[in-house]
Design a protein with these regions (language model features):
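Intracellular coupling helices
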Residues: 246-287, 345-353
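Membrane-interface junction motifs in transport/secretion proteins
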Residues: 1-19
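Conserved G/P- and acidic residue-centered "switch" motifs that form tight phosphate/ATP-binding loops
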Residues: 88, 106, 270, 295, ...
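Alpha-helical membrane-protein architecture signal
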Residues: 22, 212-216, 225, 231, ...
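Mid-to-C-terminal secondary-structure elements
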Residues: 20-225, 231
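Hydrophobic alpha-helical transmembrane segments of multi-pass inner-membrane transport and secretion
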Residues: 225-261, 289-290, 294, 331-334
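Short coil/turn motifs that cap or connect alpha-helices
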Residues: 84-86, 90, 259, 272, ...
């Protein structure tokens, strides 16, 4: 469960009051019966994070400065959200403002900036401070913090201890974001949302709590626009498939009809019925095959466009490509074969007399 509250208030504009609230509220959350772990984070998975400029001090792209997702967290954040650590350690209560600045980065960040091996122990530079990478976490999906639109994805993300977050940056983040109080329970408990609100209210009765949500609710909200876009795209795709089928049927049928008279003459001169049917069908099916080949080549470019807008679209989907190609090929075969039955009714003598 996730509770959200605004900290965009003057009384939390200094580090001492901010950290005191986090520590006391997390302790209150942990006191709720059935709670396994509790933590606070600026954002949670599926949400847009703060965009922040970070320079890589060493690694594959040493010296490069880029904007990435930044999330401040308290200890147990990864445990509460069940985000596995792939390397190194998590952030702990020992990571204070007076200790070495540290961070956990996700696999997407490590792969892009630090290289695939020995990422733990590398260093980042931010606001004149050197930050040591102490852990690599698994990726979670989220919108990019510095783009509008596009699908949620595994964006490069840096997680830093809330105690080491610069106060000015914390205050700026609270203008745009409502921090999240996260708990993980041993099972489903009735009234857990009310207990979370009571725990926060016990620490600060004036804390403006905007709501309590399940992670499934946050995921649904994050994917709402994606669902609308996917439904619209599916409808348009079905319409395009229908129009393609009608077009292929009409084109192939027309090609066959145009050659009916010619084939009647060929039959009068000794061509067999089977040979005439093959001759008239071949051109239409060949034209369809050429069109399918061109469509398959263009599909790779179309997939890249769709992937830039929708989450979870596979780069290669041979099953769908084969199914659509087979359907259109079947339409072409039917369109080519049906008119050929007229050939069987052609009287070669009548055709010669007409000529």
């Amino acid at each position: 469960m996730v509770a959200k509250a605004s900290l965009d208030e003057a009384r939390y504009n200094n580090q001492a009051s901010f950290l005191k609230l986090l520590e006391e509220s997390v302790a209150a959350m942990q006191g709720i019966p059935g709670v396994q772990s509790a933590a606070v984070g600026l954002t949670v998975p599926y949400e847009r994070a703060l965009n922040y400029s970070v320079k890589v001090a060493d690694g594959r792209q040493a010296g490069e400065q880029d904007i990435t997702n930044l999330v401040y967290v308290t200890p147990a954040y990864f445990e509460a959200l069940q985000i596995p650590l792939r390397e190194g350690r998590s952030l702990t209560v020992g990571d204070r403002s007076t200790s070495q600045y540290v961070a956990v980065v996700n696999q997407a960040f490590a792969r892009k900036y630090l290289g695939r091996e020995n990422s733990v122990g590398r260093h980042l530079l931010s606001d004149g401070s050197t930050i040591e990478v102490v852990g690599i976490s698994a990726n979670v999906i989220a919108p990019s913090g510095f783009t509008q639109g596009g699908p949620i994805a595994a964006e490069p993300t840096v997680y830093v201890p809330a105690a080491q977050m610069p106060t000015q940056l914390v205050n700026l983040a609270h203008v745009w974001f409502q921090p999240s109080w996260i708990i993980r329970t041993k099972g489903k408990f009735a009234g857990i949302a009310q207990q979370m609100q009571q725990a926060l209210g016990g620490v600060d009765p004036d804390l403006p709590i905007s709501g309590v949500y399940g992670m499934t609710d946050l995921l649904s909200d994050a994917l709402l626009l994606q669902h609308i876009e996917a439904s619209l795209l599916a409808t348009l795709s079905a319409l395009a498939l229908l129009l393609s089928s009608v077009g292929i049927y009409g084109l192939v049928s027309n090609l066959v009809n145009q050659r009916t008279r010619e084939l009647g003459i060929r039959m009068a001169l000794g061509c067999t019925l089977q040979g005439a049917m093959f001759e008239v069908s071949r051109a239409g099916i060949a034209a369809t095959g050429a069109g399918l080949a061109g469509g398959l080549l263009l599909s790779s470019a179309a997939v890249k466009i769709v992937r830039s807008q929708l989450f979870g679209v596979a780069l290669y989907d041979p099953l769908t490509l084969c199914a659509v190609s087979a359907f259109l090929a079947l339409v072409a075969v039917v369109a080519a074969v049906l008119p050929t039955f007229r050939i069987a009714k052609i009287d070669p003598a009548e055709t010669l007399r007409a000529q």
